[in-house]
């Protein structure tokens, strides 16, 4: 992949990122808080923040969501201004919203890759082999003889007036029932999984939260370089180590 910016910070400011643990919080309340912080950052006020939290069960639909993607059981959906399609949030899933004024010139793809890198590093530390799938954002486990590729972390962002909003969702020990009524992120040929399911032990949000906080801040500050973690896909040749590639983003 084309890695031209990871030796320096993705952030405009050099002041420390303020990490806040909001616990379990309603989606609308968290969204309003995001917008308030983002407006301050666009004016050069306040500090970059990383909000870490869980939501009560809720579906959110990004700008590319189509009618066919909506829940088959008629569950209500919150329409939001991030990229991507529909997803589910709920207890047992760690959500992170970095509200960050980005360095200029703004590079959205680079920013997303840094968030992916942070989550990949956490999975690796926990003992999971994960990576990226060409043309799809997020963090994935490779396909096996019996299982399709499985997404363990999703990313959906918006950049407005040079400030990033929304962010990451990382499945720790969440129930997967919420995903059954939708096609998560509009991807029909892959699955969804959790850390608990893949590691064969209970992995809680509380265990993972400090790891994610550290990794995200390191990635945004340029202390965690973005590396090539492309997963081999059926019918493709795995990329050579340290190879570079320009990626598309969905």
Curated annotation (Swiss-Prot):
Origin, by domain of life? Bacteria
Annotated pathway: Protein modification; protein lipoylation via endogenous pathway; protein N(6)-(lipoyl)lysine from octanoyl-[acyl-carrier-protein]: step 1/2
CC per GO annotation? cytoplasm
Q: Which residues form a coiled coil?
A: none
Keyword line: Acyltransferase, Cytoplasm, Transferase
- Catalytic machinery residues: 185 (acyl-thioester intermediate)
> Any idea which GO molecular function terms this record carries?
lipoyl(octanoyl) transferase activity
Composition-biased stretches, type Polar residues, lie in 239-250
The record's subcellular locations are: Cytoplasm
Q: Which reaction does it catalyse?
A: octanoyl-[ACP] + L-lysyl-[protein] = N(6)-octanoyl-L-lysyl-[protein] + holo-[ACP] + H(+)
Q: Main localisation, per the record?
A: cytoplasm
Q: Does the keyword Acyltransferase apply?
A: yes
Q: Which residues form the BPL/LPL catalytic domain?
A: 44-224
Instruction: Return the annotated site residues (Lowers pKa of active site Cys).
Output: 151
List GO BP terms, alphabetically: protein modification process
EC number of the protein: 2.3.1.181
Pfam families assigned: LplA-B_cat
Query: Does the UniProt entry include the keyword Acyltransferase?
Result: yes
Q: Where does substrate bind?
A: 82-89, 154-156, 167-169
Q: Which SUPFAM superfamilies does the UniProt entry name for this protein?
A: Class II aaRS and biotin synthetases (SSF55681)
InterPro entries per the record?
aa-tRNA-synth_II/BPL/LPL, BPL_LPL_catalytic, Octanoyltransferase, Octanoyltransferase_CS
In its miscellaneous comment, the UniProt entry states: In the reaction, the free carboxyl group of octanoic acid is attached via an amide linkage to the epsilon-amino group of a specific lysine residue of lipoyl domains of lipoate-dependent enzymes.
- Could you tell me what this protein does? Catalyzes the transfer of endogenously produced octanoic acid from octanoyl-acyl-carrier-protein onto the lipoyl domains of lipoate-dependent enzymes. Lipoyl-ACP can also act as a substrate although octanoyl-ACP is likely to be the physiological substrate.
Which family, according to the similarity comment? Belongs to the LipB family.
Q: Which HAMAP family does this chain map to?
A: LipB
Q: What is this protein called?
A: Octanoyltransferase
The beginning of the lineage is: Bacteria, Bacillati, Actinomycetota, Actinomycetes, Mycobacteriales
